[in-house]
């Protein structure tokens, strides 16, 4: 009996063990299948998983090799690889020095697959991996080198030079262009066969561009469009024969050698005025480039051996190319971006703002609208001071904007700032010597500002930081603005975000007081004398710079840089900047209000902001073409200059005044950051 029980117990134990083993095996298969679905991303944060997935897909798609439909590449793949055709798309490319030096890694051209190609393009648009903006940049080098073809570059791009040139910090900047299949269908433009490019001309030569396409200068930090009606003049720093803004001989000597490109003045030709250019919907830069191309074709230069292209690029040391922000604040805050990509996007936006301030400083006196101009071709930001004083509508708009800005600055002072920021010093030696004469101080201020602009455009941030600090000690608004942005991102210094915010707030306060004083004094003396052209130019320049500073203050509040994060106040500052006339702020405000990311959606206000940005050359997104419907149009008073813009700005100011009651409520707790800024007072 006991033997039978023991045998039965042994059989049951064996059966249970077998069942457990089978269940364990099935469970392992399930875990393996689940692991294959997770692809190794389990346990990671969402951003890390996205970054890892982006890297793996880049390797599978072999983004650094050229995609091609040619039968030669397919035949090479069939000969050099063994296995099924489905394994051809799984060939990985080395992405590190260890993988590059490995003898077991096979690098061959990847078979073009439409589905994988669109996945690659989507990843590139999300993560911003390729550092090229369009296909024209890809052929900049090949246009200057007639014996070099794009395919030759990829044939010589083997694993050895990957291992030598790989750098984690410059990885995304050193990637090759996206492997678009249409690159093989386009023949790159080549230079003339009878001339050979010099080593210095390879970087500056540009291909022949298609018609109605603006010329550009390739630069990592150059912005897009700042002032669409900007006209080059011989009085600015952009020309080789030009004189700097200051009367200093030392700055003249330094700035004379900054550019060798020719600059054609447009002031003598009445057909090239701002109103005519805006009516024809073309920029003055294009007209000047076309004229230079025509003159060069009629009278060829005998001194130059290389042919002169129709679009002669302007030296980057002379003046930044006019561009606008290429990425919005919402895109820079996207959770799908890695930290390094966010930092690069924010730094690029800051460089665009700095270049915009330089263009405002150098170009504003060239593009002022004529007096008593009642045409819609004149921009709202360029209306002369005389017209603003003579028109009750324009005068009331400026008074309302000044009042709204003063209310916002006082609200920031009461709720966020606990130090006296008006005593901030910028230079290494503090404020200027009081014993010096005012003329000498003015000379030194302009001298330091011109040198700071020169070194910034040469990417010499150390010298630019020092000269902007010295110029800001003499209360120069442009230099103080650039100095504050340098402090915010730690260019040539350690990052000091709170001190940077105080510098921006100080500059905004001083500019606002200057605008109020200028408008009041001009209004009182209007019966006796009229405002001269210089005063009108300075007024418009200060208006544009104040709009740019308000936009950067809104960026600080949106990101929480050096101040407590307040997205509602950030949106209010951005909308206020758009009302002053900043094109980037107008586009950003329209985007925020159309999406309802911060506050409730307001389609009418979004349409008004989008239309204002459209007047300055920034079209709304493709999905926002509804802003041009007739129900979003306003009746314009054509007795004032820029009648359509004035109608939209008036509606925006009324909306801002109705929503500014929040800023007169009980103050909140201040940000206690006295320790971080007391030694800069």
Curated annotation (Swiss-Prot):
Sel1-like repeat positions: 547-582, 583-618
Residues with the Phosphoserine modification: 70, 196
GO cellular component, one term: cytosol
Bias (Basic and acidic residues) ranges: 23-37, 296-306
UniProt-listed GO biological process terms: cell division; negative regulation of G2/M transition of mitotic cell cycle; signaling
Biased amino acid composition, Polar residues: 191-203
Coiled coil: none
SMART domains: SEL1 (SM00671)
Major subcellular location class: cytoplasm
Subcellular location: Cytoplasm
Sequence ranges of Low complexity compositional bias: 92-103, 238-278
Stored InterPro entries: Mitotic_Regulator, Sel1-like, TPR-like_helical_dom_sf
Record keywords: Cell cycle, Cell division, Cytoplasm, Mitosis, Phosphoprotein, Repeat
Matching PANTHER family: ACTIVATOR OF C KINASE PROTEIN 1-RELATED (PTHR43628), CHITIN SYNTHASE REGULATORY FACTOR 2-RELATED (PTHR43628:SF1)
Protein name, per record: Mitosis inhibitor nif1
Biological source species: Schizosaccharomyces pombe (strain 972 / ATCC 24843) (Fission yeast)
